[in-house]
Regions:
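Cross-family detector of peptidyl-prolyl cis-trans isomerase
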Residues: 2-6, 23-201
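Sec-dependent N-terminal signal peptides
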Residues: 7-15
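C-terminal motif of bacterial Sec signal peptides marking the signal peptidase cleavage site
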Residues: 18-22
Length: 201
């Protein structure tokens, strides 16, 4: 009878332990993005007050007024190129990029949701991706239209200039976006696409 009692007890406890484990996992995932909109709003305010970041107003916003902190992207220049021209809205570009969310407990450097290269960036080894300048979120497009060939920027984009309240695969709604962008080259409609392999800046 004692053996039967222990068997019955084990059958009762094991499912409960599984439920506790599952609940703990769910709670952890939920906590990762708890108060997500408020946290992202607070980060934008920090960017806005950081004098080390260059403020560039989004091309879609009224350029004659000051606007709000959500109307701007905030740029840290990692490398300055030698180019003097910038891509137009209708141009195509060769870029390398890495996109992250704001830091969280599990991802202190920010969760990487997309990237065209792995490891440390190198002009010689990074894979370049072709985009149409105007086909991206407005914050990314704004950055490209201010960059020159050879520039590498870290661009902080408020969610208002990203995907807004919408979720995109691994990007929750109300997510600010942080992109490392390297602009190798660009060309106008009708021009021959330049090659990028083995090129040096």
């Amino acid at each position: 009878m004692k053996e039967l009692k222990y068997i019955l007890l084990a059958l009762i406890l094991f499912p409960l332990m599984g439920m506790v484990s599952a609940c703990s996992s769910d709670d952890s995932e939920e906590d990762e993005y708890a108060n997500w909109q408020e946290r992202n709003d607070a980060v934008v305010n920090q960017w806005s007050n950081n004098s080390a970041l260059r403020k560039i107003k989004c091309y879609t916003k009224d350029q004659t007024t000051g606007g709000t902190s959500n109307d701007y992207i905030y740029v840290e220049v990692l490398e300055e190129g030698t180019g003097t021209e910038s891509p137009l809205f209708t141009d195509s570009v060769w870029v390398a990029y890495r996109g992250r969310l704001i830091p969280t407990t599990s991802y202190p450097d920010g969760y990487v949701f997309d990237q065209s290269y792995s490891g440390d960036f190198s002009w010689q080894t990074a894979d370049m991706t072709q985009f149409c300048t105007g086909a991206l979120v407005s914050g990314f497009t704004t950055a490209l239209m201010q960059m020159h060939r050879g520039d590498r920027w870290r661009v902080h984009i408020p969610y208002h200039l990203g995907y807004g309240s919408s979720s995109k695969t691994s990007i929750p709604g109300y997510s600010n976006l942080i992109f490392d962008i390297a602009l190798l080259d660009f060309w106008h409609p009708g021009e021959t696409r330049p090659e990028f392999k083995s090129r040096e800046i």
